[in-house]
Amino acid sequence: MTIPVNQRETQVEGWELMAQHTFGDSGFGFQANYTIVDGNLDYDINLNEEQWVVPGMSDTANLVGFYDKDGLQVRFALNWRDQFLASAGRDPLFVEEYYQLDMNISYEVNDELSFFVEGINLTEEHQRIHGRSTYQLREFAIGHARYNLGVRYAF
C-alpha cells in the first residue's frame, strides 16, 4: 500500500520573543528577538531511506542597535540562525549554525531625497553545509562583505 506524500500531516509550532527599547529622546535604542520553531517530525541520520520532514526549520535570533534622529539613521544588526536540514533524502544536507553582522546608514535630506550605505556580512562569516556528519563537508562558501551605496528619491 502506498500513500501520497501530500496526504501526510505534521504540526509545526513556533514562538517569537521580542523586545524593543529607546533611550528617551536620544535617538538610541535596541531591538532583540528570538524565534523558536519546532515540529513533530525528526530526521534520523542513521536511516538510509526516504523520510518525510519539513526542511528549513531552525531557531533564529537578532540583536539590533540603532540611532534614529534628525534624518540620520544608523543600524547594526547581529543575526544568528541555528543549524537546519536543507534537503532530505538518502543524502541529506545540513546548513550549519551561522552568524552575520550587517549595518545600514541613511540620511534623509527631505521627504523625497535620502542617501544610504549598507554593509552585509561585515565580519565575512563563511557558510558550511555538511551531510550526515559534520565531517562530511559538502559545500563551503567563503563569506565576503558586500556593500551598497545609493540614493532614494520619491516623487
Model-derived features: positions:
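Surface-exposed coil/turn segments at beta-strand junctions on protein surfaces, enriched
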Residues: 23, 56, 67, 94-96, ...
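Residue-level "hotspot" positions that anchor or transmit function at local structural transition points
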Residues: 7-9, 53, 93, 97, ...
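Gram-negative outer-membrane beta-barrel transporters
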Residues: 2-88, 123
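Feature captures outer-membrane beta-barrel proteins of Gram-negative bacteria and organelles
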Residues: 59-70, 101-105, 136-138, 149-151
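Residue-level detection of beta-strand scaffold positions
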Residues: 28, 34-36, 66-69, 73, ...
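C-terminal beta-signal and adjacent terminal beta-strands/loops
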Residues: 80-85, 106-155
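Short, surface-exposed loop/helix-turn segments at secondary-structure junctions
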Residues: 88-94, 132
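Residues that define the transmembrane beta-barrel architecture of outer-membrane proteins
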Residues: 11-13, 57-61, 97-101, 143-147
